[in-house]
């Protein structure tokens, strides 16, 4: 036909069989990518330390999504929570449990192959009676009825996902955790039908809304399968034009993309920090700092020493309170996982407490999210600056040497140790600026010391960008179908006359090609 690359889709505009074929092929490609990507991630994933080297620091993208739906173990014998897994006989007594990372990946690949074969079949056998309008004998699609069918099927899947998979009636449930991402596990969830169900961090709301949305969609599907749209509405919204369906579908996709970009970036029960990493706002607001301090104060009130109080802090909680885990530290065009930046975390050094020569307890002002460099400033309990690392020594008034700053560690690997050498104290002050101090292995991966973003940042960036592109795609195709008669200069219902290649002379019905 000699069509340019950006016009090739016109080949399926009036060919329902092959329109179906290309959609089947698209689904096959998506399934194939998902399964292949899962196998690749499993090949490079290191499950040895679920606390300091979780999947979101290793740049895993599809594994977190599998995990939040209830997949937690691998055929290799490990689980995402750190416990070993004993492989028991599964389907047909085979020692391969298909509700595992490898099992789900392989099922996607097998299904991809089946969809590929279906696409080939429908491309070859495109001229089916199913797609023929009995009134005209021409290929046609009853788009309003197809819309109803899609609504019903979508509602059926949505309802069953909420009713069976999430509740555990026939399924594993979903990933749930506490507010600080410490106790993550898979759990059967009961639906929450009250106002609490609208809390974005209440898993019961996810179940209830899937059930309710499924019922609503099925009702809508039955309605559109049984009722015909009014003629004026059918004409006004160009319901007979497949480009209308395209514009509507794009709207659904970009709407969903904007929503999930928001739930990922701002945090939601479906995007737990144990699987996707903390949000940037948890660093901005000192979310984990406050919880750690609350726990320490509680221990001190019960008579514990500073060392005992800080030693009771879970290493996992301390690790969240580190700026290198904020997705906003990724920077533009910094490819790779977080581990490729600051390295693989090995151990918590402990909580540093600074003190000046006058005996005042000092704290280091922490690095804001959007700064790469920030002055090292130490303030007392009233916020008064008492020490710093000066840019110009000749004008220094608050240098560590002048103010006699020392540092003592409580909890962690350096528990009970005090450092008085100014060079050592400065080193730990620079680390304290980034949050809790950790030792990192930078040699294994050749880490370059430049922060990267987490899975949360990549997902948000990708979906926000594509949502914007699809938004303009919706405007483009929606305008084309609504104002087709204006753009083409003819009535919208005379599409046959301008079909490419149907007539020797465009629009002349007497020159139809046989």
Curated annotation (Swiss-Prot):
PSII is composed of 1 copy each of membrane proteins PsbA, PsbB, PsbC, PsbD, PsbE, PsbF, PsbH, PsbI, PsbJ, PsbK, PsbL, PsbM, PsbT, PsbX, PsbY, PsbZ, Psb30/Ycf12, peripheral proteins PsbO, CyanoQ (PsbQ), PsbU, PsbV and a large number of cofactors. It forms dimeric complexes. It is a multi-pass membrane protein. The keyword Repeat does not apply. Coiled coil: none annotated. The chain crosses the membrane at residues 21-36, 109-123, 148-164, 211-226, 245-260, 465-480. It is found in: Cellular thylakoid membrane. GO terms for biological process: photosynthetic electron transport in photosystem II. InterPro entries: PS_antenna-like, PS_II_antenna-like_sf, PSII_PsbB. The keyword Ligase does not apply. The gene is psbB. Binds multiple chlorophylls. PSII binds additional chlorophylls, carotenoids and specific lipids. GO terms for molecular function: chlorophyll binding; electron transporter, transferring electrons within the cyclic electron transport pathway of photosynthesis activity. This is Photosystem II CP47 reaction center protein. One of the components of the core complex of photosystem II (PSII). It binds chlorophyll and helps catalyze the primary light-induced photochemical processes of PSII. PSII is a light-driven water:plastoquinone oxidoreductase, using light energy to abstract electrons from H(2)O, generating O(2) and a proton gradient subsequently used for ATP formation. It comes from Prochlorothrix hollandica. It comes from the Bacteria. Belongs to the PsbB/PsbC family. PsbB subfamily.
